[in-house]
């Protein structure tokens, strides 16, 4: 007889239980992130540690976002406790989860907490678990005077003098009200309610009932709620990404749709009986010195290098903190004013933004534009999907156009947040940038006469600086501000001379100007321009505005004349605060200075102000005539008269003036906190609405010519092969041997040999006969949702992402792929795709009995990591390697694979930290590319064949006829050394490699301060040592 089932909780059906579990699951993720913050940013004692079994260090963005959330809630409680009152005080945390805020405050501010009782309230199930954890933790129980742990079926789970824990569903307000009035609250008391991202998971009616009930619990009540909102509607890229995330978790946000704005949230509380309510975004609070003082903001950078400012601002702009009170209204809070547009400042009707957005095209952020011609530009370096890139993407205006000037060579280290400034004759200067925020670059590279070479380095590494061309006796590149590797915000001006090929310091007049990075620097003419925006040393966007003029003395030294026009522009322009920007791009056009994207202080850039125009002609007139008020200097272009594509996220982008009346925008996007990444894909062309030209700018598929280093170019003869021409066809391709494996010992010998073989004659089950299109559709289910790759060409590239991920039904996919569509399915976990590897038996149970590995491959079965199902149409998979060994079992159709031994990786254009090559091995004419110094091997798999692929063998695959169906089984062949943590796809590099890459960064950094040629000399010697060790 089996064990008796526990009775279900009274009044709670299984659906409600499941919903509650999903909501409680969001708390698990939240406290792991808060634990990460605690470990780094909080002094001991630590309290999250008792509720988080496996701590994880989150990214700097997640850490700072949760630091701000934690600070907001804690400061609100401290403010409440500091208020003078003759009543006992109670802090009621509604939906507290495992948050240990009471214990943290009792430990750090015991005197301040003397007259306050903390009451945690959440689901019964959660509070029982919390009680169990607290009971076992002396460090917490010692803080709780006269603590008593009550039975699980009691409403009050924990009772002590300073702290109580209550188990109650917030939808059961009758029970909660009874418990609080009978067992917790005296008749006269001051109450502060807390609700940190908890009520929004309730249906709106239930959440509003809590808000109304709370206003009547005490005549001296306050409410602090922290939740998400839509500062610019649900279609904003961050907002839409956030909403998809919570929906995918099964815990959608409800209140945000009913009360999307701050004004509506305030009115919600007033309608519920609260005398006054005031809401502010977290980004607004971050910028408030009274809430987070400047020294505290600056101190955070010393704990953890940070440069995710755009993403931090987007997060903070979508979360609000609202404070409401039932106390008599003393003075009405100032109403929120929005910067409106009038016919004089709204110029959106005069412009249009044309989008050309093929999915997966141009996914790159924080790069730089490489000038080429009026029909071609490059997008250099920056951050790709996986890592920083050293490559340059080519964009052209018409099909068949090729670049006319050289792009930066591949041996310039990958970087982001650098500048490239265009000079005459299509010369240009590349300056600085960074790897990590603690590892800036000071090297500089110049293209002159269509050749790239290094030039004098900066005095110190510099990134997030601003640069512009000026012309005096010759051309100069003027550089201002930025940050350096130790986190210092710079306030110096430098000028690089195209004649002398060196840097010189630029003196300035005595006017006070704050150091900054990410500022807007623009030209008005050859020697003068404007400076505004940027983030200062204390972590807020600056709101000043300067004009500058560069002078040259007779001795050749340079002098900068700065004039502060902040007050003048604030007085005469209603949109002045909309150009206080960080990370925007500025281009000189016939219309004036066009300011694109970035972030602004305290709020978000709304769609109607994404692109701004500063009329430099009007500005010059105003300066000359004493700033009359009838001039329109700043106007808004927004996103133009009509937007014919998805809304772009204009951060991390680049832009350039193609001609005096067209601006081309490329790249950009952001990591939307923990919700996912949004990419601004394709090309965007801003032009006058009267223009008749269309946006024909497009990304040319990746180059097939290997990047030659500068030294190779200097020593080799010019090649007749252009970058857009194919390789020669490989003449010698070794066939992979075919073998029969009859027992595990034979396969063990193959493993020890470490070379690929095709195993034939094995029994993999009835799948080879059964798995037709009709059978698979019926067995899997035609309505089942899957995610597939949809390719734009016959060759998929992981580097350029010339494909998109599409969610569709399995039946639709099978119809389309069998009709010849370029689609590819690599199955992922059906239950937890971001946490668990694919498992054919679990993900497709109806297929599990059809497929089996032969007994001779028992070592594979015993050490299996994952077993994805692969179904491919006429599309080629990119060249890549897997860290784990695997066997590829061909079930239906045929497939051709080309493999390269691990020693060939140095010739196959695999960027550092990546596992995929940039080369198309299968060329458009069907031949295999001949890559010098490599030894390609070929496998043609027929039905029932099993290809053993050893670890690190690079391989690419292409169907040779109809649809290919295969099962891929990855297995662990090492006892240790794999990457720590989660590895869903089995392709994370070994721990030793990742550690060594960090060591390389440290080695390179140790040469900071040396002349660049000396540093290069020694780094090349070290590289030779590494190569010698690798070849022993």
From Swiss-Prot:
Coiled coil: none annotated. S-adenosyl-L-methionine binds at residues 69, 95, 122, 169-170, 196. Residues 716-725 have a biased composition (Polar residues). The keyword Nucleotide-binding does not apply. The keyword tRNA processing applies. Disulfide bonds: none annotated. Pfam families: Cupin_8 (PF13621), Kelch_4 (PF13418), LCM (PF04072). Residues 833-988 form the JmjC domain. GO terms for molecular function: tRNA methyltransferase activity. It catalyses: 7-[(3S)-3-amino-3-carboxypropyl]wyosine(37) in tRNA(Phe) + S-adenosyl-L-methionine = 7-[(3S)-(3-amino-3-methoxycarbonyl)propyl]wyosine(37) in tRNA(Phe) + S-adenosyl-L-homocysteine; 7-[(3S)-(3-amino-3-methoxycarbonyl)propyl]wyosine(37) in tRNA(Phe) + S-adenosyl-L-methionine + CO2 = wybutosine(37) in tRNA(Phe) + S-adenosyl-L-homocysteine + 2 H(+). Residues 702-726 are annotated as: Disordered. Gene3D superfamilies: 6.10.140.1470, Cupin, Kelch-type beta propeller, Vaccinia Virus protein VP39. Keywords: Methyltransferase, S-adenosyl-L-methionine, Transferase, tRNA processing. Pathway: tRNA modification; wybutosine-tRNA(Phe) biosynthesis. GO terms for biological process: tRNA methylation; wybutosine biosynthetic process. Probable S-adenosyl-L-methionine-dependent methyltransferase that acts as a component of the wybutosine biosynthesis pathway. Wybutosine is a hyper modified guanosine with a tricyclic base found at the 3'-position adjacent to the anticodon of eukaryotic phenylalanine tRNA. May methylate the carboxyl group of leucine residues to form alpha-leucine ester residues. This is tRNA wybutosine-synthesizing protein 4. It comes from Aspergillus oryzae (strain ATCC 42149 / RIB 40) (Yellow koji mold). The gene is ppm2.
């Amino acid at each position: 007889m089996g064990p008796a089932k526990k009775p279900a909780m009274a009044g709670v059906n299984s659906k409600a239980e499941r919903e509650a579990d999903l909501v409680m699951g969001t708390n698990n993720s939240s406290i792991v992130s808060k634990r990460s913050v605690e470990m780094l940013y909080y002094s001991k004692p630590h309290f999250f540690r008792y509720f988080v079994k496996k701590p994880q260090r989150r990214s700097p963005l997640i850490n700072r976002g949760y630091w701000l959330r934690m600070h907001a809630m804690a400061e609100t409680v401290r403010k409440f406790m500091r208020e003078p009152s003759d009543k006992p005080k109670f802090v009621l945390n509604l939906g507290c989860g495992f948050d240990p805020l009471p214990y943290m405050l009792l430990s750090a501010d015991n005197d301040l907490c003397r007259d306050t009782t903390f009451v945690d309230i959440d689901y019964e199930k959660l509070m029982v678990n919390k009680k169990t954890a607290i009971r076992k933790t002396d460090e917490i129980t010692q803080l709780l005077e006269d603590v008593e742990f009550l039975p699980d079926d009691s409403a009050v789970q924990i009772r002590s003098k300073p702290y109580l824990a209550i188990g109650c569903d917030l939808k059961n307000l009758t029970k909660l009200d009874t418990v609080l009035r009978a067992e917790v609250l005296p008749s006269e008391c001051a109450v502060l309610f807390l609700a940190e991202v908890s009520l929004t998971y309730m249906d709106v009616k239930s959440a509003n009932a809590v808000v109304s009930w709370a206003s009547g619990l005490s005549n001296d009540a306050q409410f602090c709620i922290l939740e998400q909102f839509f500062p610019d509607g649900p279609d904003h890229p961050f907002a839409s990404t956030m909403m998809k995330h919570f929906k995918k978790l099964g815990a959608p946000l409800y209140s945000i749709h009913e009360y999307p704005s701050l004004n509506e949230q305030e009115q919600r509380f007033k309608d519920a009986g609260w005398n006054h309510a005031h809401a502010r975004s977290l980004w607004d609070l971050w910028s408030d010195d009274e809430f987070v003082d400047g020294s505290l903001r600056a101190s955070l950078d010393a704990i953890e290098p940070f440069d995710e400012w755009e993403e931090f601002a987007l997060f903070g702009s979508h979360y609000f903190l609202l404070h409401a009170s039932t106390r008599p209204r003393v003075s009405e809070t100032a109403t929120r004013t929005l910067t409106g547009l009038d016919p004089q400042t709204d110029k959106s009707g005069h412009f249009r933004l044309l989008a050309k957005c093929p999915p997966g095209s141009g996914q790159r952020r924080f790069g730089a534009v490489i000038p080429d011609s009026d029909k071609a530009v490059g997008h250099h370096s920056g951050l790709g999907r996986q890592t920083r890139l050293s490559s340059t993407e080519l964009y052209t205006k018409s099909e068949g156009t090729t670049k006319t000037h050289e792009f930066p060579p591949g041996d310039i280290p990958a970087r982001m947040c650098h500048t490239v400034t265009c000079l005459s004759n299509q010369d240009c200067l590349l300056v600085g940038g960074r790897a990590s925020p603690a590892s800036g670059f000071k090297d500089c590279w110049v293209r002159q006469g269509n050749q790239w070479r290094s030039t004098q380095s900066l005095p110190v590494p510099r990134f997030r600086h601003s640069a512009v061309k000026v012309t005096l006796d010759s051309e100069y590149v003027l550089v201002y501000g930025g940050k350096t590797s130790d986190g210092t915000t710079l306030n110096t001006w430098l000028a690089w001379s195209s004649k002398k090929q060196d840097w010189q310091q630029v003196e300035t007049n005595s006017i006070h100007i704050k150091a900054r990075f990410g500022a807007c620097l623009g030209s008005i003419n050859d020697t003068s321009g404007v400076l505004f925006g940027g983030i200062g040393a204390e972590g807020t966007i600056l709101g000043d505005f300067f004009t500058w003029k560069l002078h040259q003395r007779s001795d050749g030294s340079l002098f900068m004349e700065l004039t502060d026009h902040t007050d003048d522009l604030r007085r005469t322009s209603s949109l002045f605060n909309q150009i206080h920007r960080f990370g925007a791009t500025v281009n000189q056009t016939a219309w004036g200075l066009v300011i694109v994207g970035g972030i602004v202080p305290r709020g978000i850039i709304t769609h109607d102000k994404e692109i701004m125009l500063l009329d430099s002609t009007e500005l010059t007139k105003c300066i000359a005539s004493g700033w009359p008020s009838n001039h329109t200097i700043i106007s808004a272009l927004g996103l133009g008269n009509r937007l014919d594509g998805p809304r772009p996220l204009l951060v991390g982008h680049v832009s350039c003036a193609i001609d005096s009346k067209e601006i081309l925008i490329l790249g950009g996007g952001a990591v939307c906190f923990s919700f996912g990444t949004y990419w601004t894909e394709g090309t965007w062309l801003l032009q006058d609405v009267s223009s008749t030209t269309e946006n024909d700018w497009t990304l040319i598929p990746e180059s097939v010519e290997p990047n030659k280093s500068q030294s190779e170019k200097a020593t080799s003869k010019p090649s007749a092969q252009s970058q857009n021409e194919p390789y020669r066809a490989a003449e010698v391709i070794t066939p992979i041997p075919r073998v029969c494996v009859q027992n595990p010992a034979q396969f063990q010998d193959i493993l020890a040999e470490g070379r690929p073989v095709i195993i034939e004659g094995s029994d993999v089950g009835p799948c080879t006969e059964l798995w037709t299109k009709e059978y698979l559709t019926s067995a899997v289910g035609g309505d089942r949702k899957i995610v597939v790759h949809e390719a734009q060409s016959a060759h998929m590239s992981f580097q350029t992402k010339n494909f998109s991920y599409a969610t569709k039904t399995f039946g639709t996919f099978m119809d389309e792929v069998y009709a010849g569509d370029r689609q590819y399915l690599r199955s992922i976990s059906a239950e937890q795709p971001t946490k668990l590897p694919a498992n054919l038996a679990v993900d497709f149970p109806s297929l599990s009995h059809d497929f089996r590995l032969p007994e001779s491959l028992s070592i594979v079965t015993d050490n299996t990591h994952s077993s994805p199902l692969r179904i491919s149409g006429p599309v080629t998979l990119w060249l890549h390697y897997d860290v784990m060994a695997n066997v590829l079992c061909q079930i239906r159709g045929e497939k051709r694979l080309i493999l390269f031994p691990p020693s060939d990786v140095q010739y196959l254009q695999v960027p550092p930290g990546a596992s995929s090559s940039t080369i198309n091995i299968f060329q458009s004419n069907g031949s295999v590319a001949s890559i010098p110094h490599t030894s390609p091997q070929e496998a043609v798999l027929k039905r029932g064949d099993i290809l053993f692929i050893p670890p690190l063998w690079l391989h690419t695959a292409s169907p040779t006829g109809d649809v290919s169906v295969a099962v891929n089984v990855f297995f662990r062949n090492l006892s240790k050394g794999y990457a720590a943590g989660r590895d869903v796809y089995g392709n994370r590099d070994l721990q030793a490699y990742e550690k060594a890459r960090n060591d390389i960064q440290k080695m390179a950094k140790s040469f900071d301060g040396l002349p660049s040629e000396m540093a290069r000399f020694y780094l090349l010697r070290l590289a030779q040592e590494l190569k010698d060790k690798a070849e022993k």
